[in-house]
Structure formats: C-alpha cells, structure tokens
C-alpha cells in the first residue's frame, strides 16, 4: 500500500553551511563537497582550510542524500566527514524509511515533477528547503521500500560497472590505434 508523506515526515532536511564564515583564524585542512550538476554517487571533493568550530551536523554521514539547490541534482554520499556547503540541501532519512529507496525516488520522474511546482526564479531555478519540506512523496510500506531499494542499488552497481567497461574499451581503442601507428611508422 502506498501512502503520501510530506518530505519532512520522512527525512530531516536542512541547508549546508556557509563555508567562508569558517575560513578565518586558525584553520585545518578538510574536504568539502564540490558543486556538481551530474546525478551520481561519484562525488567530487576539494580540500579547503576551515576552522574546527563547524557544527558536526554539517559533516556528511554515511547515506546522506544531497540535493543541489540550484539545479536539483540528487546524490547519495557514502563517505563520512565531508563538509556540505550551503548550495546543497542535506536529506537525512528518518528511521522507518529505506535510504536507497528514498534516494531512487528522488532520482525518479516523480520528484522533479513535484519540485517544478515549487522552484523559484526565471532563468536559474532556486530550490528553498522550506519548500522542499512540503513536497508530497508516495511511499510504500517499509518491506517494499527495502526490497526495491536493494534492487535499485544493485542496478546502480551494474550501471557503474558497465560505465567502467566502456571507459576501458575506449582506452583499448586508443592504445590499439597508437600501437598500429607506431608499427606502421617503423616500416
């Protein structure tokens, strides 16, 4: 059975931190999430010098979901301890809901359709976390979430492996061409 939930009923949702405020005084090197417009689990980070006074809630936890507020890109974080900057909404799924299912629901056609109703701006669409919290999402019972969450996670792994295979094939193609040209050049 599917039930509609407001987004803030299934997850804690808040905006990341304004990093520049923490770059004065005594600082340490930390990883920060880079802005990305690609839907992916392959998250890029960069090193920045920041104060150690940053509230722990702004550091990533395993299975955090982040949504880029200026483009609605949805990503799932596997690594802990990465600073999440203010141009991301952090989604921490509450107990009783499956993280993998919620992540894939947010990547589905349903979420962008609901999001389209609330975004502001003409040229650059901006998402506000207060509006995000009001989005209605259809959620099945927990067992169904877990079952399909596992399926989607396995499908993601297969997609990533196939992408790696494609990249290896491209490298092989270049290497074969290079070897051919070297061989023909020796004659």
Where are these regions (language model features)?
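A general structural signal for short secondary-structure boundary/capping elements
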Residues: 76-81, 110-117, 133-139, 152-153, ...
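A short beta-sheet element
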Residues: 68-106
